[in-house]
Curated annotation (Swiss-Prot):
Gene3D superfamilies: 3.40.1190.20
Domain YjeF C-terminal: 11-337
Source taxonomy: Eukaryota, Viridiplantae, Streptophyta, Embryophyta, Bryophyta
GO biological process, any: metabolite repair
Natural source organism: Physcomitrium patens
Protein name (Swiss-Prot/TrEMBL): ATP-dependent (S)-NAD(P)H-hydrate dehydratase
Function: Catalyzes the dehydration of the S-form of NAD(P)HX at the expense of ATP, which is converted to ADP. Together with NAD(P)HX epimerase, which catalyzes the epimerization of the S- and R-forms, the enzyme allows the repair of both epimers of NAD(P)HX, a damaged form of NAD(P)H that is a result of enzymatic or heat-dependent hydration.
Enzyme class, UniProt record, top EC level: lyase
EC identifiers of the protein: 4.2.1.93
Cofactor: Mg(2+)
Entry annotated with the keyword Transferase: no
Molecular function via GO: ATP binding; ATP-dependent NAD(P)H-hydrate dehydratase activity
């Protein structure tokens, strides 16, 4: 599903129904409030790409929660992002004991927690880094977000965190993981290889049966949706498998995964709102042609949009294509790739 013109003609009229209509009576925030948890001394571009992609797609507000070493840089990229320098890493605090770490984690959770309920979806991982104190704080944020029933999109070092601590995310149906090929292999090794005595410690991932293996992995994760990125993107929640093979761009410039994460977060927030509306038009069509699961709908829509935007950017810029060029096309492709946006 999702590649040839016949399939797209079937899918797009369904996907477009979850996109909120722009109308004079709507107020700021109704088209989506997205948060990105990520950004440290080394990595400032990734959280910016994810957050600005959400805005360019049509979300009303985008927040970034990062370390103090990343905040000023991210703020300088765009005045449209709301940046919170509340995360901490070992470099900031030096050598501290377990009691101090626990207190620091509580402080971070209090700062982030007072904002959480405002968000329609949270992206976790772009530019996060792997500092142990920082990851401990983010693990606590994930638990709090789950308690508040907020959709989560995990990418980059967010995937590193939940691959090593899968109990953080197993059984949470509003979570989307977006692994590339290598990240997917590590997930399979952790979830299947280490937990099932009937399979090898490092089970082989077969390209021939990737959809089936992905569905099995999602099922073992008890309803988590997985968007496995590759030549074809495969998406599964353990119940069914969708695919997105619309040709995008041969350029593999860094940051495209961050664009996908931000875009998917917006679509998930729209889909969740759509399915919660008992009077939403065309709900049966969306359920039959795509899925009744907002994370599946959001992941497929995000994948298709990013592929089309990347294709347009490459057609214009060729080998010079960068992630910034792809972001420029998001809003335009959202308007023209589908049908009803106003």
């Amino acid at each position: 599903m999702g590649g040839n013109s016949t399939e797209l003609q079937k899918i797009l009229p369904a996907l477009e129904k979850v996109v909120p209509v722009l109308a004079p009576g709507r107020h700021k925030g109704q088209a989506g409030k997205i948060a990105v948890i990520g950004g440290c001394r080394e990595y400032t571009g990734a959280p910016y790409f994810a957050a600005i992609s959400a805005l360019k797609m049509g979300a009303d507000l985008a927040h970034v929660f990062c370390t103090s070493g990343a905040a000023t840089v991210i703020k300088s990229y765009s005045p449209e992002l709301i940046v919170h320098p509340v995360l901490h890493e070992s470099y900031d605090v030096g050598e501290i004991g377990e009691e101090e770490i626990s207190g620091l984690k509580d402080k971070v959770l209090a700062e982030v927690g007072k904002w959480l309920q405002r968000f329609d979806c949270i992206v976790i991982g772009p530019g996060l880094g792997r500092d142990p104190i920082l990851l401990d704080c983010v693990a606590a944020i994930i638990e709090e977000a789950k308690f508040k029933n907020i959709p989560l999109v995990l990418d980059g070092d967010g995937l590193f965190l939940v691959t090593n601590q899968p109990e953080l995310i197993i059984g949470y149906p509003l979570a989307i993981l977006t692994p590339n090929v290598m990240e997917h292999k590590r997930l399979v090794a952790k979830i299947v290889g280490e937990r099932d005595q009937n399979v090898p410690q490092n089970p082989e991932v077969s390209n021939e049966d990737l959809p089936g293996q992905l569905q099995d992995l999602a099922k073992r994760m008890e309803g988590v949706t997985i968007l496995q990125k590759g030549k074809t993107d495969y998406i599964s929640d353990g119940k069914t498998v969708l695919s997105s093979d619309y040709y995008g761009s041969p350029r593999r410039c860094g940051g495209q995964g961050d664009v996908l994460s931000g875009s998917t977060a917006v679509f998930v927030s729209w889909a969740k709102e759509y399915f919660s509306n008992e009077n939403a038009a065309g709900k049966k069509e969306v359920e039959e042609r795509v899925s009744n699961n907002p994370t599946m709908v959001g992941a497929l829509a995000g994948s298709l949009l990013c592929r089309k935007s990347a294709a347009n950017a490459f057609a214009q810029h060729k080998r010079a294509t960068t992630t910034t060029n792809i972001i420029e096309y998001l809003g335009h492709r959202l308007f023209t790739f589908m049908l009803r946006f106003y």
